[in-house]
Amino acid sequence: MNAVMTVDLSELDAWSAQVQRASDDLTGIARNGGHSLVQTDFGPILETMMGAYNALLPSVNQSLEDNGTGMRDHAEALRATARDFTLTEDGVVRRHNAHGVDARDGSSSFFDVAETTIRRAAPTETSLPQISFGFPYDTVCDLVRMLTGFDIRAELAEKIGGDVVGASMQGSSFGSLGTSMKGVAANLQSGGQTISKTWQGGAADAAVGQIGTWVASLDTQAAQLVQMGQNVVQICRDAWQTALAVVQCVKSAVQTVSAALATMSIPGVGWARVVQAVFQAFQAVMKAYQAIMKLINILKQVKSFIETVKNFFDGDKAPVSTATAPTATGAPGSVTRDPRSVATPTVGQRPVAVTA
């Protein structure tokens, strides 16, 4: 049975260059991730998810590094394949004592179809609203605790501190990296489709199939990164809004009790007004407490999602890049060509079908 193999070395050279660009892009993504996705402490307001988040980052960064390394190996394998074909051509020329002509004239078919520049990450939130501490606040806290047993400082104020600016910056970085990776996958897919038009045979099928595996892997990784970024950005927005709600509730409580304290010296009604105001303040701070509990429940859901993403990246391995190239040593018998092509070897041109 004869197997048909055709190759245009100009096209193969251009494709290996495109795969090398993809490797450079993936290396840049890994470098950016190493700088922007760092383990840290975003404070008590995001504390519920921080353990899972910090455990995720090493897995993500390792996968990003593996992508760059694996794609670089694949680009080198394609260059080796092109060299192999050239040696084979030279062997055929020597066998027939012919004059070889390298007709490679370059190729403009392998242009990138998607942008891979990593968008500069920026925070999506400003600093958290804060409670102004002072004598009125402490007085209200003491009165509420004395009459209700609820400590505003421990249950509210200390829980709304944190760095949502830095957290949302990292969320933005996740999205930028995922978007860039989608672009790399699109470029590889386009290149694989283009090379299939001029390179056929077992080696071509193996190399193009491997690129297809890469495209699927990168697309899946990119989707995880983008979703992760969206969730982090959203939880930062939720945290900011929760902090604002807490501050507004506490301010309302302070104003209510402060107004009552101003009338405490009135005989018969002063203390009663204070007690009534304290209970009104308690109702206000309980709304704030409920807002924090709602945020914590959302954080628990985000934590579960982060753990799922970590499991994905822990199990995700970059495709093994060992492109199956014909092992040609340049010996005359490596490839049997149509005799019509021997006098002027067709390196770099679209040749007649080669039988092997």
Predicted features along the sequence, with ranges:
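Intrinsically disordered, low-complexity Pro/Gly/Thr/Ser/Ala-rich repeat tracts
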Residues: M1-S173, S180-T198, Q210-T213, S217-A356
